[in-house]
């Protein structure tokens, strides 16, 4: 049954590519025009939401713990800080929206009102790029430098490392784990509890980081669009068989390197062209023995796109022009390397 579904999906993409500009399809799958793949993005969002909740809950547990009775000033500051985090969480993550349409953890998005889906789409990137999520990611980056010690609950980082401060939360140096851990007022149980809190804080922050790093798209759909578009275009461009074969045979690079491409995409401010740029670059680097003849064929394909742009510039996405320029640039670099 699964195989049939994939075949139908491929047939649908083949049909769609015939009727749509391939870069517009690329935009739709990436989500850079406001469209998002709910079956991919919704589970990702839930993971982010849960990990953010776990992060704040861990700080809340510490604030209410008996060990903090020994640090009244720190406790009060932490209490106020946690209140601010919960307020931010309520603002960004507490909308029920799609949750109420879940049945046993699954959502049939065809049954969700369009207005609900549109609202989620509008708020999705605002939420995952919020100050709250950014704070947790920065906290994760700081703690990741001590990854092995924290995951092993090794107090070395709080006892032996230089400095008087170990504050894993940006802009909140009042939460100093070295100060808490090394107090003479603590029992051994208190010390173990403090290390456990640091461990839970880090694993929750890692959960946010890992969820954020999940691509918003189905890579297989993107592969199918590339293959289907090549299949359509090569019928219109004769004597470029070798170059088209190279593109088709190199689609595995997209899947292999996609996490890197996606990180670059996010870092570029969600510019989808960066994915294609990096993909073309990797095809070039993976083709050290590419001949001048194949290089010429690549340029013929690029010329085809340039001609399309010249005749349909008002209706075609301007990103196509950028893509063509990037491909030409990579081919020029390849030619220089061979000369």
From Swiss-Prot:
Induction: Expressed in the late phase of the viral replicative cycle. Its main location: host cell. It comes from African swine fever virus (strain Badajoz 1971 Vero-adapted) (Ba71V). This is Protein H339R. Interacts with NACA (alpha chain of nascent polypeptide-associated complex). It is found in: Host cytoplasm; Host nucleus; Virion. Belongs to the asfivirus H339R family. Keywords: Host cytoplasm, Host nucleus, Host-virus interaction, Late protein, Virion. GO terms for cellular component: host cell cytoplasm; host cell nucleus; virion component. It comes from the Viruses.
């Amino acid at each position: 049954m699964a195989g049939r579904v994939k075949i139908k999906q491929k047939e649908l993409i083949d049909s769609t590519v015939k009727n749509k500009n391939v870069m517009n399809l690329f935009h739709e799958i990436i989500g850079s025009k406001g469209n998002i793949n709910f079956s991919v993005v919704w589970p990702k969002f839930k993971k982010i939401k849960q990990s953010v909740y776990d992060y704040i809950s861990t700080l809340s547990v510490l604030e209410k713990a008996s060990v903090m009775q020994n640090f009244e000033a720190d406790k009060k500051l932490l209490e106020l800080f946690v209140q601010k985090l919960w307020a931010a969480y309520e603002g960004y993550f507490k909308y029920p929206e799609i949750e109420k349409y879940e049945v046993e953890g699954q959502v049939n998005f065809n049954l969700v009102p369009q207005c609900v889906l549109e609202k989620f789409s509008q708020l999705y990137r605002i939420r995952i790029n919020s100050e709250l999520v950014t704070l947790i990611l920065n906290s994760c980056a700081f703690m990741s430098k001590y990854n092995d010690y924290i995951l092993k609950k090794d107090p070395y980082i709080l006892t032996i490392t230089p400095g008087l401060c170990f504050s894993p939360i940006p802009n909140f140096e009042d939460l100093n784990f070295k100060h808490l851990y090394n107090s003479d007022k603590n029992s051994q149980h208190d010390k173990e509890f403090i290390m456990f809190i640091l461990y839970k804080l880090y694993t929750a922050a890692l959960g946010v980081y890992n969820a954020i790093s999940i691509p918003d798209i189905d890579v297989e759909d993107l592969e199918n669009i590339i293959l289907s578009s090549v299949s359509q275009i090569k019928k219109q461009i004769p004597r470029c068989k070798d170059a088209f074969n190279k593109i088709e045979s190199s689609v595995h690079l997209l899947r292999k390197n996609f996490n890197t491409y996606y990180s670059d995409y996010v870092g570029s401010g969600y510019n989808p062209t960066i994915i294609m740029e990096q993909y073309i670059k990797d095809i070039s680097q993976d083709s050290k023995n590419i001949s001048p003849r194949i290089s010429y064929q690549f340029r013929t394909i690029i010329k085809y796109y340039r001609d399309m742009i010249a005749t349909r510039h008002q209706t075609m996405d301007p990103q196509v022009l950028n893509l063509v320029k990037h491909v030409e640039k990579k081919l020029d670099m390849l030619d220089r390397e061979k000369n």
